[in-house]
């Protein structure tokens, strides 16, 4: 809105579906195709997508398909969101692959919807340990610069000790109850600390800020993160939920439910942040935007221009691919004669044909979650190589065989291990590379059909929202293929799940020629 990208009419339509004229409260590329790049709902989908977007960017550059450059993937998430398995489940990949092009910013306001994230503990320390253990560079932005004078003044070390020992539930209390409460309960534990703030008013104590609300500290963290090499970075920023709302909801458990501020709360918010709106205008709750020639707007526009334009911004311009002629699949269109073959085997043959095609072969990416041998794809290991940023530091035991396990810095296959969510996220990153990198790819994710939509349905819905372009192959499908392995291997319903996604076309091929 301040940049001029959103009109007042659009702002009026926030959280309203108005035939393309509304603003969705969550990121949805389908609803705002020129604006949002990534759908980050449900919770946890943003972090895992960010990891694999960064991973795929490195993959594409390793293969020489895009320039490596200095692009960064930024993911903004909450401390409560980190309890979602998808939020932290893939961070070891980022550390292992040394994805220095990835930055997480975790808004640690210490609260979930219902209550504290770790009322009896300290979520920032917990997350620090998890990320450090996974090989990440961790930057903590805990206390704002208004604390600096007190820290310098404290010669006993008690202030730092008190900061470290207090639990998150109490930190929430300090902001909710006002300056007198932290004077008594935070500083009051040690007489030396009470003396430290004896010359401060309760209001001054109340405005001892947290690091995530201090632009100087945040800038320093961002500068360090963008310059760091050899590791992904996570910034843990200490904030207050409902910051600025005062008694209307600051640090309150019901902040999320506050839909409208009364006149006194509006006046308090205006005064706190110095917004130039007169008393007689407050009840109308007008939008405030500085004039076009104001220093603020001119500065903002200069900075955005120097940084390459506004964010977010989604682009969908790319060069169209040339579809291979039908004769390319001549062998798959012929009868197999007396020999019966599975559609899974037929797919592998189709894939081999496509990879050899001169026009689109380099765009084909097979993705497997530790099932290549199950599907008879191991012949591609040596032919294409399995991508890894480290290459192959060991001699595989089967290196003298034709189909040995070959890892390569320029490998084509993405072998994601026993990790359907990761494999689907890699597929999603490649299936949207036409938009994110102006590099259209054709990813084929092949999986046990029962562990496809049933396992990663949320990511499949996100793929539809993202307008992803690629192929999902549910192999060994059917209720009779793997009866002996039990109910979890008897899939006769994947198409029902696939059909819930409007822009996902599903096929149930019975013969090789249909598949081709």
Language model features by range: what are they?
Residues 1-97, 121, 377-380, 387, ...:
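Cofactor-binding active-site loop characterized by glycine-rich and histidine/acidic residues
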Residues 6-16, 95-107, 128-138, 461-479:
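A glycine-rich helix N-cap at a beta->alpha junction
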Residues 37-39, 66-84, 102-104, 364, ...:
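A short, small-residue-rich loop immediately preceding and capping a beta-strand
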Residues 57-67, 431-452, 511-513:
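Glycine-rich phosphate/pyrophosphate-binding loops
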Residues 73, 78, 86-90, 104, ...:
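Extended, hydrophobic alpha-helical segments in both membrane/secreted and soluble proteins
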Residues 76, 81-85, 103-105, 109-420, ...:
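Conserved acidic/glycine
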Residues 226, 259-263, 267-270, 275-279, ...:
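Internal gly/pro-rich beta-alpha loop/helix module
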Residues 260, 393-403, 459-473, 484-498:
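Flexible glycine/proline-rich, aromatic-decorated loop/lid segments
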């Amino acid at each position: 809105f301040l940049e001029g990208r959103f009109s007042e009419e659009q702002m009026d339509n926030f959280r309203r579906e108005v035939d393309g004229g509304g603003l969705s409260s969550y990121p949805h590329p389908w609803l705002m195709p020129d604006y949002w790049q990534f759908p980050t709902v449900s919770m946890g989908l943003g972090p895992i997508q960010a990891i694999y977007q960064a991973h795929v960017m490195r993959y594409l550059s390793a293969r020489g398909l895009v320039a490596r450059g200095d692009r960064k993937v930024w993911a903004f998430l909450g401390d409560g969101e980190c309890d979602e398995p998808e939020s932290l489940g893939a961070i070891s990949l980022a550390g292992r692959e040394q994805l220095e092009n990835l930055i997480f910013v975790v808004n640690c306001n210490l609260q979930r919807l219902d209550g504290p994230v770790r009322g009896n503990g300290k979520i920032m320390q917990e997350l620090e340990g998890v990320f450090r253990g996974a090989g990440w560079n961790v930057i903590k932005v805990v206390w704002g610069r208004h604390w600096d004078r007190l820290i310098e003044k404290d010669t006993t070390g008690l202030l730092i000790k008190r900061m470290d020992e207090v639990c998150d539930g109490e930190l929430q209390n300090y902001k909710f109850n006002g300056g007198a409460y932290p004077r008594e309960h935070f500083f009051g534990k040690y007489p030396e600390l009470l003396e430290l703030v004896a010359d401060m008013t309760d209001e001054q104590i109340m405005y001892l800020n947290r690091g995530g609300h201090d632009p100087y500290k945040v800038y320093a963290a961002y500068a360090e993160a963008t310059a760091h090499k050899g590791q992904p970075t996570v910034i843990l920023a200490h904030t207050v939920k409902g910051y600025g709302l005062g008694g209307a909801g600051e640090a309150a458990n019901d902040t999320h439910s506050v839909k409208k501020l009364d006149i006194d709360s509006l006046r308090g918010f205006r005064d706190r942040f110095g917004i130039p709106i007169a008393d007689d205008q407050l009840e109308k709750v007008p939008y405030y935007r500085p004039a076009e020639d104001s220093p603020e707007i001119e500065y903002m526009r200069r900075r955005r221009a120097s940084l390459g334009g506004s964010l977010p911004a989604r682009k969908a311009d790319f060069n169209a691919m040339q579809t291979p002629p039908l004769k390319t699949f001549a062998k798959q269109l012929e009868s197999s004669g007396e020999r019966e073959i599975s559609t899974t085997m037929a797919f592998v043959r189709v894939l081999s044909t496509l990879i050899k095609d001169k026009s689109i072969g380099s765009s084909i990416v097979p993705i497997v979650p530790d099932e290549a041998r199950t599907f008879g794809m191991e012949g591609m290991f040596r032919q294409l190589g399995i991508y890894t940023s480290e290459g192959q530091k060991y001699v595989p035991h089967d290196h003298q065989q034709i189909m040995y396990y070959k890892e390569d810095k320029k490998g084509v296959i993405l072998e994601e291990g026993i990790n359907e969510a990761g494999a689907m996220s890699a597929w999603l990153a490649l299936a949207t590379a036409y938009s994110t990198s102006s590099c259209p790819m054709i990813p084929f994710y092949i999986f046990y059909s029962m562990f496809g939509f049933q396992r990663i349905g949320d990511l499949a819905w996100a793929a539809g929202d993202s307008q992803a372009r690629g192929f999902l192959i549910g192999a060994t499908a059917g209720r009779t293929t793997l009866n002996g392995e039990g109910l979890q291997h008897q899939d006769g319903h994947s198409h029902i799940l696939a059909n819930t996604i409007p822009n996902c076309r599903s096929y149930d091929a019975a013969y090789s020629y249909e598949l081709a």
